[in-house]
Swiss-Prot record:
Family per record: Belongs to the diaminopimelate epimerase family.
PANTHER family the record matches: DIAMINOPIMELATE EPIMERASE, DIAMINOPIMELATE EPIMERASE, CHLOROPLASTIC
Native source species: Rickettsia typhi (strain ATCC VR-144 / Wilmington)
Disulfide bridge map: none
Name of this chain's protein: Diaminopimelate epimerase
Amino acid sequence: MINKINFVKMHGLGNDFVIVHKRDLATVCNLSQLAKNMADRHTGIGCDQCIIYEEYNNVYTMIIYNIDGSNAKLCGNATRCLAKLIYLDTGKKDITIMVGKKKLLCNVEAANKISVNVGNVSFNETWMPSRDRIWAFAERYMLDLKETMCVDIGNPHLIIFSKLEPQDQKIIGQKLQAKELFVDGVNVNFAEVKDNKIYLSVWERGAGLTLACGSGACGSFAAGLKLGFVHSPSTVVFKYGNLIMQEEDGNIIMQGEATFVMRGEYYCEK
């Protein structure tokens, strides 16, 4: 038996997603496996993450699957993409999206100007190891880290303010998934600050190095503010574009593009 699943593919600054409405998945039992299959760039559609969404009482809920089938707690780029899709389908400009218990307030100012208020961030959570433990771990593996800071923005991020080559970022990103340091893994951000701009590369847990990471941009901006490296507003720079970051009353607001790629049908053999 073959199931036909309608999907939309979008990207935020190169960070790409396959988006499916939950109503099209009534006959699918294993969503995690479906996400892995759809995300495969050789045998599926290909993406960094799969997004499943639905609406209830004018609030949208979003579930995020990584390419390994695990769940992600937050994705800023996916939030902008989903907000734009909802805008294109319904005309709504003010959109509330829930990811777990996290409420994201979105505003579509124009088709390619989408703001997301991700709320406040935390620098003191139980999952965060001490700075001394991070540095001891780095010394053991001869990792060249500069200033570091842990940030929780709904998902866990480690911000490393240091310029590193992509091959070194990959090694460090993998090493820092060690259970002894971060029990559930961590998103590792490599940030370089110049003229109030943050040049950012992110190793996402469950996905690896991606072309952009919205939650990483929010976390890196928040850490940069706390350390006095940047001021609000600031710009986070990725390979395929920028995000404008602001802080208002303790809330982090991200503004950027979301690009529609295609609508299609995915055929799932049972």
